[in-house]
Amino acid sequence: SCTIKDLPVPLYYCNNGYALSSLSITDCLVSINTASTIFIAFNGQGWIKDLSFSNSTIYYTVPGSAYFVQMRGRTPSNFSGSGWSTSLRKMSNCTFYQIGTNNRFFNNVINSNSAVFFLEMQNTIFADCVVSSATGTEGVFRRICNAGNYGNVNYTLGYNTYYYSAVPGGFLDYDTSDENGRDHSGTAIKVEPKFVNAANGDFTLSSSEHIAKRCGDPRWLPTTE
């Protein structure tokens, strides 16, 4: 659990070929005030086997142009002796805002046909993330799966929102030129989250649909009796 305001540098930085078995961001509120700051940066040959975000809000106070998570195309098999054969990416009840507005989110995180990857993404809100223009060219799901590797990703998706204020209609949960790279769960909530004041870091929800499904970081939801 943590609160970090105006993070100027990566929360976690590694420039060598080290690997973590797991990294969890839980019950955190983090604002980043520099567009080029990478949140988690493995700029060498490093890797995180299991990476999870839960009950957290991470947002840029200016449109973020950097990767949210950067790893240099490693896979579990690159770490001999680890015994790793699978990898997990999990996002549950999180709120993300203005991340990867230059078509960036994750890079080369799911990159190998010889590894098994699991993606669990549920009750999470992505607002103004991973879109580069008024017409939009990217999508959250596509960028996590590193376009073209969907076949070896075992994914569980439920009640996520992909809202883009600059896109006509407000939603673009996939790259229109890449039909595979979208949320096919049939559960995506295509209604504006209606944050109270996102520009000033208040992501309290007024959308009845999101409140009913308990979407996003719980800190922005009304308490239940």
Identify what each model region corresponds to:
Residues 1-201, 224:
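Extracellular beta-rich repeat passengers
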Residues 178, 198-225:
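Surface beta-loop-beta hairpin patches that serve as ligand-binding interfaces in beta-rich domains
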